[in-house]
């Protein structure tokens, strides 16, 4: 019979965020630039004019692209093939991911060969081996780093990756061994912009995806705290819990489908309405599944928390704000990330965390606990709850 460990020998079950960085693509893509690209290649049609009207009203100041305005990608007469899109991701996306990762590692204060786990996520590439394999070599990670590559989860991918890394590091804690996880999200949707325009011209179905998505990479470093060194940053946030919720009857609401020229985004106009229903329900599920919070009624009040909501679009943020009874200031970092960059898919939630971290560094008064929420394909809502070091509910729930 195996004797249980004495309580004092059970490792403290906490996983912390100790490094954050993002790297948006170098070129700005404004509403005027997209309109010029569209009119260069296509004649006026009702669907094109409607898309361009939406494009002027997104409330996005600019998005980012790996392509400059004079790049061949925007001017060539033919649509890039799926194979060419794959090559473009490798040429432009992987350096973005490498830069964001290097900055996150620098922010953490450790060295690459101390990374024990790598959790990568993208929905804009499907190569084998995945970009995580290339990234290991570029960053100088150990050959036996535990790698996971996530795909097929869309805008929820940043929180999904955090959830997976969190659970992996808790496993290392149970073994009593040091663990540091690098989370990397990389999205280059403007690679598929030409094919998206072409599909819209052929089908005459208005596609708002053309107006929302931008290119970015972002990274986090997580630590289980075992073997902490003086050079390592102290925890920025501790992860209390992560909770995914898949909603029945929503399978046709959001897709990112494969076709012969790349990916085609389908974004249903019902998404803001669904956000207003899904996010409060997911929040209640998150709190009820967090033992250190579940028993007190006050913990089910959304306004008692800070918030980072993925900006699927402006209407999505407004719907979440209204449904949760929050103010625009409560979601200021989400609105700021949307204005500066638009929807950068799985990377966006990490950009928002970076903004909140920087605010806190400059003396911003923030609540001790922070709720993250992002709707991905499925529809699946990914949520997480973080807490500042030193606040109550420190231990993993």
From Swiss-Prot:
Q: How does this chain assemble?
A: Homodimer.
The UniProt family comment states: Belongs to the thiolase-like superfamily. Chalcone/stilbene synthases family.
Q: Which residues form the active site?
A: 155, 377
Top-level division of the source organism's lineage = Eukaryota
* Annotated protein name in UniProt: Acylalkylpyrone synthase csyB
**Signal peptide boundaries:** none
From the UniProt record, report the name of the gene that encodes this protein: csyB
Matching Pfam families: Chal_sti_synt_C, Chal_sti_synt_N
The top EC class is transferase
> Which Gene Ontology terms describe the biological processes this protein takes part in?
polyketide biosynthetic process
Could you say which residues bind CoA here? 50-57, 267, 312-315
Which GO-annotated molecular functions does the record name? naringenin-chalcone synthase activity; tetraketide alpha-pyrone synthase activity
- Name the consequence of residue 265 to F/V: Leads to almost complete loss of catalytic activity
Describe how expression is induced or repressed: Expressed during 1-3 days of culture in DPY medium.
GO cellular component annotations of the record: type III polyketide synthase complex
Q: What is its EC number?
A: 2.3.1.-
Give the recorded effect for residue 377 to F/P. Answer: Leads to complete loss of catalytic activity
Q: List the disulfide bonds.
A: none
Does the UniProt entry include the keyword Translocase?
A: no
Q: What does this protein's UniProt record list under function?
A: Acylalkylpyrone synthase that catalyzes not only the polyketide chain elongation but also the one-pot condensation of two beta-ketoacyl units to produce the 3-acyl-4-hydroxy-6-alkyl-alpha-pyrone (AcAP) scaffold, a precursor of csypyrone B. The enzyme reaction is initiated by the loading of acetoacetyl-CoA onto Cys-155, and subsequent thioester bond cleavage by the nucleophilic water generates the beta-keto acid intermediate, which is placed within a pocket.
Q: Where does substrate bind?
A: 214-215
Checking Gene3D superfamilies in the record gives:
3.40.47.10
Q: Which UniProt keywords apply?
A: Acyltransferase, Transferase
Give the source species: Aspergillus oryzae (strain ATCC 42149 / RIB 40) (Yellow koji mold)
């Amino acid at each position: 019979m195996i004797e249980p460990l004495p309580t004092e020998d059970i490792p403290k079950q906490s996983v912390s965020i100790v490094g954050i960085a993002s790297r948006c693509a170098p070129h700005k893509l404004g509403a005027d630039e997209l309109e010029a690209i569209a009119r260069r290649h296509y004649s006026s049609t009702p669907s094109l004019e409607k898309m361009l009207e939406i494009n002027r009203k997104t409330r996005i100041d600019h998005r980012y692209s790996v392509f400059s305005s004079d790049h061949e990608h925007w001017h060539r007469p033919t649509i890039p093939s799926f194979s060419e899109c794959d090559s473009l991701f490798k040429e432009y996306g992987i350096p973005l991911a490498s830069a964001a990762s290097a900055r996150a590692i620098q922010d953490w204060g450790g060295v690459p060969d101390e990374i024990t786990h790598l959790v990568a996520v993208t929905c804009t590439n499907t190569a084998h081996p995945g970009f995580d394999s290339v990234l290991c070599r570029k960053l100088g990670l150990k050959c036996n780093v535990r790698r996971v590559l996530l795909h097929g989860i869309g805008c929820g991918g940043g929180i999904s990756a955090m959830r997976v890394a969190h659970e992996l590091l808790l496993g290392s804690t149970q073994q009593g061994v040091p663990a540091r996880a690098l989370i990397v999200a990389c999205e280059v949707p403007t690679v598929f912009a030409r094919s998206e325009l072409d599909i819209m011209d052929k089908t005459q179905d208005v596609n708002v995806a053309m107006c929302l998505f931008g290119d970015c990479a972002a990274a986090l470093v997580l630590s289980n705290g075992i073997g902490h060194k003086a050079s390592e940053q102290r925890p920025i946030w501790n992860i209390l819990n992560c909770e995914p919720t898949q909603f029945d009857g929503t399978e046709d609401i959001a897709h990112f489908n494969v076709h012969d020229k790349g990916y085609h985004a389908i974004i249903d106009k019902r998404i803001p309405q669904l956000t207003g229903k899904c996010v409060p329900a997911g929040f209640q599920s998150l709190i009820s599944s967090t033992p250190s919070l579940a028993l007190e009624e006050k913990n089910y009040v959304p306004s008692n928390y800070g918030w980072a909501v993925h900006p699927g679009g402006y209407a999505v943020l407004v719907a979440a704000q209204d449904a949760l009874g929050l103010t625009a200031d409560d979601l200021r970092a989400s609105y700021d990330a949307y204005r500066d960059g638009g929807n950068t898919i799985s990377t966006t939630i990490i950009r928002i965390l970076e903004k909140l971290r920087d605010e806190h560094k400059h003396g911003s008064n923030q609540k001790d606990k922070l709720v993250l929420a992002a709707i991905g394909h499925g529809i699946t809502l990914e949520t997480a709850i973080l807490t500042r070091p030193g606040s109550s509910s420190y231990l993993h729930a």
